[in-house]
Amino acid sequence: MRILLFAAAALSAVAAETALDRYIAKPDPAFTWKPVGAIPCQKCTATVLDMTSQTWRKPEEISRTTWQHWVTVIRPEKTVSDIALLFISGGANNGRPPQRADDMLAGIARECQVPVIELRMVPNQPVRFPGDTRDRTEDSIIAYTWD
């Protein structure tokens, strides 16, 4: 049994590189982040970051090429691990940072005693495609890109 587990682990370690692996590993000069400040959070420390994650498409293909996000890092008073839970959420790019930590996520951080990170504004929206007559959000963005 141990030999089988070792063989499976070895094979997974040498799995072929995919297009997604190459995309994620490719440096993007747009990537940056900076702390914005602390926000209220019961029995936790919550910090908001302003993060630019990537450049997506070219300016002639879409109205917003640079993806900007609000990231909230919630750290409970007592932690048992530095490994964090990551929650990816939606929202629109309206320019205002979060004013307080999400109560549910703060509760998870306290109960699990681990940091919790919320990455907002995925996908970045609204966006407009050339020749389109309206701004698109969420599934409408996905549907448009399938054409």
Identify what each model region corresponds to.
Residues M1-A7:
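Sec-dependent signal peptide recognition
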Residues A13-E17:
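Boundary at the C-terminal end of the N-terminal hydrophobic targeting segment
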Residues L20-D21, D102-A106:
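Short amphipathic alpha-helical segments and helix-helix/interface helices
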Residues I24-T79, A106, L119, T145:
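N-terminal cap/lid segment of alpha/beta-hydrolase-fold proteins
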Residues T65-T66, P97-A101:
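Short, glycine/acidic-rich beta->alpha junctions
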Residues W70, S81-G91:
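Short beta-strand element of the alpha/beta-hydrolase
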Residues I88-P97, A106-D147:
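Cap/lid segment of the alpha/beta-hydrolase catalytic domain
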